Amino acid sequence: MASLKEDIVIQLQRISTICKLKAPVVVVWCMTYNHANYIKDALDGFVTQIASFPFIVIVHDDASSDKTSEIVREYGEKYPDIISPIIETENQYSKSDGSLDYIMKAAIKATGAKYIAMCEGDDYWTDPLKLQKQVDFLEANPEYGMIYTKIQRFYQASGKLKEIWGGNHESFSDLLRENTIPTLSVLIIRDIFIDYQKEIKPEIRDWKMGDYPLWLYVSAKSRIKFLSKVTGVYR
């Protein structure tokens, strides 16, 4: 993998500086690409979170060709304590050289946050207490490494919210039979996530199953909690 471009290094340094002062408990990782029609829903879901602790949202725009980056910058300027953009000038996903994973890990590490949440730019959260509920549970139950919830599916063709999905598997054996975990609903302990990256190295594997291997890893290393609440929408 080539070294990071200077502009990305500068953006990561900015995030590190902010987090040294802010000391966020949660970092939210949001990847977006050509989501101009949807990204405001995601960003609004972040900035309306009500939490008793500091959190930061890193929005990685992978060189969108529409107005996604402009919208992300606008929110970054309006909510500088919450939204921290990383704006690419060339698409990292298409390189398939591990650059995107490296940037994600570097950004998450720079925050020093205890927990990680994820939500892509075309999905969004609907529960303003999502993070608070999940952090409260994990803080009170240290034997758990991750918590997830239900979500609702949105069908673009009809413009309607339809079935509710997610849960209720919590054990390795149950999850091995079926993945019932929506990524946008998850809160995970950062140290477990980092251990997974170091030990499993998903970036070098040609897996076509999203975050499913991560859920299996977490369930093998700790306990997973399913919270039977709808907290977001998947498009």
Locate each region found by the language model.
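A conserved acidic beta->alpha catalytic loop
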Residues: D61-E70, E90-N91, E120
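Conserved nucleotide-sugar donor-binding catalytic segment
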Residues: T149, W165-R235
